[in-house]
């Protein structure tokens, strides 16, 4: 490993120990905001520190084994130990390289998840409902919180569009590769001939930004319409114009929010989603310019990005970006998504490593 990388790892390891000491300090414990910030930093440094400690131990083992090679009686055992230590050292070096990759500052943030029915009419709306349920199950398994911001239901079930905020540790970093086109192939319940229909939905995942980082939006650029909230009736039927539709005139981005009974709350929610959408559009534009020579696994949330196909008759799910096919569709639809997310995260890391080695 390069001396410059070892020096960087030593500095991070020292910082990890320093933060650990600070977390035990009474002054830090009394300041909740500082305690939370240091706890986050400690968690981020822990893997690097632990891996580096293991790597240092392996270097000591290699040195000891090399010294033992001079002893004829110990040579055979020393050769075995040396081979094992070198293999382990290589594995740890690879892990450390991944841990040192530049982190996306948005990865630890909450996220807005949008699922929209595309081509396919009622069947697309039903599939949008299935996708939202799939992500909700995944969130539940990871102890994330799902809050529906806005929903437009399909005529025969599912959703024409649904927007939810998902809160928890590392939500955006885990879900960001879901942005793009999702295609379903299955026989609709109304299909008497047993023909397979193809429908599509688009998914967009955007980080929730702190207020200070939201893009500046000129109020003159907004058209705000109020309307009566639709949805289930009953005793809580909404009789006031509390639902909000905000149109950002320069970009044409439209956000609706009708989940709350208060117009003020709906407006606040809609503005936060609008800010996230504008930020996401600006980021996508920048990434496109930067990655024009290299493939970009991070979808734009556009229907032209074909991420996955879910083929129900074959029980198959295919990720077209990395040519991954699994015959475990039922598990995926129940929210067991790590088997699909992990390979694309690893592929993204491999691309980042390749980009770094090109720079070097």
Curated annotation (Swiss-Prot):
InterPro entries: PCRF, Pep_chain_release_fac_I, Pep_chain_release_fac_I_sf, Prokaryotic/Mito_RF, RF-1. GO terms for molecular function: translation release factor activity, codon specific. The keyword Glycoprotein does not apply. GO terms for cellular component: cytoplasm. The keyword Cytoplasm applies. It is found in: Cytoplasm. Residues 284-313 are annotated as: Disordered. PROSITE patterns: RF_PROK_I (PS00745). SUPFAM superfamilies: Release factor (SSF75620). It comes from the Bacteria. The modification N5-methylglutamine is found at residue 235. Keywords: Cytoplasm, Methylation, Protein biosynthesis. Methylated by PrmC. Methylation increases the termination efficiency of RF1. Its main location: cytoplasm. Belongs to the prokaryotic/mitochondrial release factor family. Peptide chain release factor 1 directs the termination of translation in response to the peptide chain termination codons UAG and UAA. This is Peptide chain release factor 1. The lineage of its organism: Bacteria, Pseudomonadati, Pseudomonadota, Gammaproteobacteria, Enterobacterales.
């Amino acid at each position: 490993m390069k001396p410059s990388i070892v020096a960087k790892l030593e500095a991070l390891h020292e910082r990890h120990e320093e933060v650990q000491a600070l977390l035990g300090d009474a002054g830090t414990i009394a300041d909740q905001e500082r305690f939370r910030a240091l706890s986050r930093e400690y968690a981020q440094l822990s893997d690097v520190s632990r891996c580096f400690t293991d790597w240092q131990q392996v270097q000591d083992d290699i040195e000891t084994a090399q010294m033992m090679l001079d002893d004829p009686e110990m040579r055979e055992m020393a050769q075995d130990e040396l081979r094992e230590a070198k293999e382990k050292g290589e594995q740890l070096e690879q892990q450390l390289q991944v841990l040192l990759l530049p982190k996306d500052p948005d990865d630890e943030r909450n996220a807005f998840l949008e699922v929209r029915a595309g081509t396919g009419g009622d069947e697309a709306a039903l599939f949008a409902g299935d996708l939202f349920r799939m992500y909700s199950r995944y969130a539940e398994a990871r102890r994330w919180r799902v809050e529906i911001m806005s929903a437009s239901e399909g005529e025969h079930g599912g959703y024409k569009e649904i927007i939810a905020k998902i809160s928890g540790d590392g939500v955006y970093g885990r879900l960001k590769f879901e942005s793009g086109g999702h295609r379903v192939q299955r026989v609709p319940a109304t299909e008497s001939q047993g023909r397979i229909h193809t429908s599509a939905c688009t998914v967009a995942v955007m980080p929730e930004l702190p207020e200070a980082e939201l893009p500046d939006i000129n109020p003159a650029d907004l058209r705000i319409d109020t309307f009566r909230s639709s949805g289930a009736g009953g005793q809580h039927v909404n009789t006031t114009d509390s639902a909000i539709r905000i149109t950002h005139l320069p970009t044409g981005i439209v956000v609706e929010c009708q989940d709350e009974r208060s117009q003020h709350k709906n407006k606040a929610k809609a503005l936060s989603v609008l800010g996230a959408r504008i930020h996401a559009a600006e980021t996508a534009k920048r990434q496109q310019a930067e990655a024009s020579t290299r493939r970009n696994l991070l979808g734009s949330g556009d229907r032209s990005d074909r991420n996955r196909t879910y083929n129900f008759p074959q029980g198959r799910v295919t990720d077209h970006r990395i040519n991954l096919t699994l015959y475990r569709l039922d598990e995926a639809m129940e929210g067991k998504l790590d088997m699909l997310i992990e390979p694309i995260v690893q592929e993204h890391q491999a691309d980042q490593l390749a980009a770094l080695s090109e720079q070097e």
